[in-house]
Amino acid sequence: MADLDDLCAARARERSDPLIGTALHVRRFLLVEHQGPWPFHALESEGLDPDVVARLVAATREVGARTILIRRPGRRSEASGRRAWAVADVENGRIRWGAWTDAADLLEACAVLREDSGGPGWSDEAAVLVCAHGRHDTCCAVRGRPVAAALADRLVDVVWECSHVGGDRFAA
């Protein structure tokens, strides 16, 4: 296990790095359930069609959004079968869920990215994301995965581990 005192989050606290204004600024997130393992660049994960990923990335850039991968804490389900996707509107606190089995099904999310979040299919339900992307940042796996597991014990259906969201030094 990594030395917790030598990880980036601990070093950032020692240096008194400012946290205000250093997180990623996006209007929306496109969340795509994918069991992993996630490589350093999560969207290059095995099982994700590169052509579909390119279209998702282009669509998210158009609307000031970002695509991140999600999975349930501590559980690994089949890499195939029915999985979730969602568009989360950060500004309005709204979310719209969909499902995919084939990579082409994810293209529906491109249209949803442009929708008004006050429309049909959108809800105020919570989604709690905890970065656990250890190949991108060790802190996220070492500190994030236990946090996600503890939260999932209390908030069973709303907690997800996620790939790196951007903005470093926030690990628990």
What are these regions (language model features)?
Residues M1-A172:
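Histidine/cysteine-enriched polar flanking segments
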